[in-house]
């Protein structure tokens, strides 16, 4: 099955929540459920938006508490930060996150070990829309649709200038091409796996 996921990142500052409901409405129009990675500060500032995402059927996962560089933190500092983020998110959703996208996409062995010690999995992406650079909708569409492949995780941001304009075209194009959009939890492997440099998982028996 040709599946991929839309991975939206939310930040407290400078990103706001102005287009959160617009994104929810667009995804609903295409009957799409996906995953939002939320910073704890943003969840604290916009609890109604966190609840709206959850109530619309989307996964709301962690993107840290303050968007610090995890590579520079100790194991305990990482655990404390993720715990605080999870508490802020679950206060609005009633569900404790099981996935996290590390700030800046940075991670190393000690970051991964700290996160997995909490029973969580770190998530990367393999297609970056670069919507945060305020490219026009056509450029964003071309970038995403030319790079998506089965199993892709596509990175978008809330409060990016042209994402609400680009997203319907991207969804229409990829759905018409036979793709199904699913939350990240439906893409990740539970069995032993390896991860390549793009963050894509492969069954361990296919390693090498």
Q: What feature does the model see in each segment?
A:
Residues 22, 44-45, 65-203:
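Catalytic domains of cell-wall/extracellular-matrix polysaccharide-remodeling enzymes
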């Amino acid at each position: 099955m040709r599946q991929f996921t839309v991975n939206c990142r939310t930040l407290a500052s400078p990103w706001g929540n102005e287009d959160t409901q617009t994104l929810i409405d667009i995804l609903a129009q295409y009957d799409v459920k996906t995953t939002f990675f939320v910073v704890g500060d943003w969840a604290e500032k916009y609890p109604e938006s966190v609840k709206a995402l959850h109530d619309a059927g989307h996964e709301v996962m962690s993107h840290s508490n303050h968007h610090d560089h995890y590579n520079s933190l100790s194991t305990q500092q990482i655990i404390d930060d993720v715990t605080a983020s999870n508490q802020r998110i679950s206060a609005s959703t009633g569900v404790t996150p099981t996935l996290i996208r590390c700030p800046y996409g940075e991670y190393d062995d000690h970051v991964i070990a700290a996160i997995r010690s909490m029973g969580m999995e770190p998530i990367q992406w393999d297609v970056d829309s670069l919507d945060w650079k305020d490219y026009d909708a056509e450029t964003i569409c071309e970038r995403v649709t030319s790079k998506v492949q089965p199993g892709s995780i596509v990175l978008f941001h809330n409060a990016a200038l042209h994402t609400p304009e680009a997203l319907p075209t991207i969804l229409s194009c990829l759905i018409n091409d036979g793709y199904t959009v699913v939350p990240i939890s439906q893409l990740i492997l539970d069995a032993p796996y390896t991860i390549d440099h793009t963050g894509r998982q492969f069954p361990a028996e296919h390693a090498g």
